[in-house]
Amino acid sequence: MALLDLKQFYELREGCDDKGILVMDGDWLVFQAMSAAEFDASWEEEIWHRCCDHAKARQILEDSIKSYETRKKAWVGAPIVLAFTDSVNWRKELVDPNYKANRKATKKPVGYFEFLEALFEREEFYCIREPMLEGDDVMGVIASNPSAFGARKAVIISCDKDFKTIPNCDFLWCTTGNILTQTKETADWWHLFQTIKGDMTDGYSGIPGWGDTAEGFLNDPFIVEPVESVLKSGKNKGQTVTKWVKRAPDATETLWDCIKSIGAKAGMTEQEIIKQGQMARILRFEEYNYIDKEIYLWTPRS
């Protein structure tokens, strides 16, 4: 089976009605397998080479996939998707050219692209790569609406915590081994958490000064607003000063109004905060048209 895009995958899956589908992080699985199969060799004195045993890497990859597939009885025999990242990233093109710019270039394992070419011909897996999308986005599009791709339920399999932002699926978080059941409510919460906290690894800072304390704010949101007052004593008597005062939101104010207010205190405009949210967003089914390849950027009202 050749490498597919999402439209081709959709067409192949028309008429299917599987109980579940396993959506795996192909980028991560292949990199891990090949890295574990690398070794140094010297063919002549003083000259060393980095080598990769592709047969060993292939076996490691197959064993990893098998271990996840058999994690639960209900997953055995389910269709398997391996998602891969395109060379062009929509976040750089449409949102911020500096997205992931501070990441050090990671050298691919030896023979990486040749290994992929062979993998793409395997019949056991659906290998999918979509123009301008990261593998994460491919996974998000499929997992957030598996019924569009011939399955009643999707399970995401990855070590990346950012998949907590994908609704309507289960997520096997390989870092902890936990299986998380995700709803739209929990996924939206995690997306806003990432928007406020930021992710310097991916090159977006969030709202300065918050970090992990964004959790407490989202669980008990509030408004902060500037209040001016005139000093009545001291050497600066008569001067006007501005303090940011915290209060509960009124009945007309939304969570987004609260987020805007803490952003304003940090010197950010609403559009700058939205930009953080767009970089934090893994695409969901309704945010990508795989027929005409159109991306619908997230807004707080979308």
Curated annotation (Swiss-Prot):
Keywords for this protein: Exonuclease, Hydrolase, Nuclease
Q: What is this protein called?
A: Exodeoxyribonuclease
Q: Which Pfam families match?
A: 5_3_exonuc_N
Which Gene3D superfamilies does this UniProt record tie to the protein? Answer: 5'-nuclease
Q: Which GO terms describe its molecular function?
A: DNA binding; double-stranded DNA 5'-3' DNA exonuclease activity
The EC number(s) given in the record are 3.1.11.3
From which lineage does this chain's organism come? Viruses, Duplodnaviria, Heunggongvirae, Uroviricota, Caudoviricetes
Highest rank taxon of the organism: Viruses
Function according to Swiss-Prot or TrEMBL: This enzyme is essential for phage DNA replication; it is believed to function in the removal of DNA-linked RNA primers. It is also necessary for host DNA degradation and phage genetic recombination.
Which source organism does the UniProt entry give? Enterobacteria phage T3
The record ties this protein, via SUPFAM superfamilies, to:
PIN domain-like (SSF88723)
**What's the encoding gene here?**
6
Recorded catalytic reaction(s): these are: Exonucleolytic cleavage in the 5'- to 3'-direction to yield nucleoside 5'-phosphates
Instruction: Give start-end ranges for the coiled-coil region(s).
Output: none
